Amino acid sequence: MKYKRIVFKVGTSSITHSDGSLSRGKIQTITRQLAALHHAGHELVLVSSGAVAAGFGALGFKKRPVKIADKQASAAVGQGLLMEEYTANLSSDGIVSAQILLSRADFADKRRYQNAGGALSVLLQRRAVPIINENDTVSVEELKIGDNDTLSAQVAAMIQADLLVLLTDIDGLYTGNPNSNPDAVRLDKIEHINHEIIEMAGGSGSANGTGGMLTKIKAATIAAESGVPVYICSSLKPDALAEAAEHQADGSFFVPRAKGLRTQKQWLAFYSESRGSVYVDEGAEHALSEQGKSLLMSGIAGIEGHFSRMDTVTVYSKATKQPLGKGRVLFGSAAAEDLLKSRKAKGVFIHRDDWISITPEIRLLLTEF
């Protein structure tokens, strides 16, 4: 078995008709493949869009709504209908499914993050198939994860999956838009995600979904940095899921970081919300970036913002003003400033176990998406 624990993400276009309504036939194609993989011993998680698509018709809308309240109402109806389809299909093969609705707050709060990961682990151990979506009905727009590509990568990293498969209506990442550029070539293997890759992914996706190729590259970055390989491939092939599970998919494969980030480091890098800014001198910058040491109070050159003990802050170079990383502090801002003024600034401010350096890939996530 090439990959045992796999997260599959299906977009709205992969489970709907051209008019945006839910396609039971497409869902059956996906669940049939999931059932075969499950019976072969794989541990599976499905991140599925489509709640709005499943619900807008039932509420009398002629087409997919645009207003936030209309979309949230459609999602409230559609999520139940969507789960009904998945549950009916999987239960006919003797498989228990579970619904989990997540929001950005479930990742930003460390305890909720750990609880979600624990629940998913139990479900997988008990051979259930978790079906995950963002909690669209109650999510505030500015506090949303925003797309299920990103959500699937966050889930894959959280549960230390062996593979993330992003299923779409496009069979991978191309050097240009294959619909308008006959010279566009698919990239079958991507070892590093950089500005050039992001530029290639700049086009928009299907009219019915929100996850274009750019969000898939963002997802691939999160997963690959966490040590999870990623496939982007078409859901239209009848055996797409099985082929991906055996590393034979017809799509684009993203090579993971050789030593993926541990769960604590993932949380710091991708989900923790920075409560302040700390500037450090050249000696501290070298100790953090080159030697993997803790940040000492004596290396702090300046503090901005108000934060408490064990809050996350972003650390910057005083010389270049560039971000060096993020960490959880052992002193609140008021106490730290008092110590600095008294010239008695001794001890550890951020322990190296609570520190993550900003790699080029993480910097791309912070600046490009």
UniProtKB/Swiss-Prot annotation:
Cellular component aspect of the GO annotation: cytosol
Gene Ontology molecular-function annotations: ATP binding; glutamate 5-kinase activity; RNA binding
Keyword terms of this UniProt record: Amino-acid biosynthesis, ATP-binding, Cytoplasm, Kinase, Nucleotide-binding, Proline biosynthesis, Transferase
Top enzyme category: transferase
GO biological process, alphabetically ordered: L-proline biosynthetic process
Record localization: Cytoplasm
Catalytic activity: L-glutamate + ATP = L-glutamyl 5-phosphate + ADP
Superkingdom of origin: Bacteria
Start and end residues of each PUA domain: 275-355
Purpose: Catalyzes the transfer of a phosphate group to glutamate to form L-glutamate 5-phosphate.
Name the UniProt record assigns to this protein: Glutamate 5-kinase
Organism: Neisseria meningitidis serogroup C / serotype 2a (strain ATCC 700532 / DSM 15464 / FAM18)
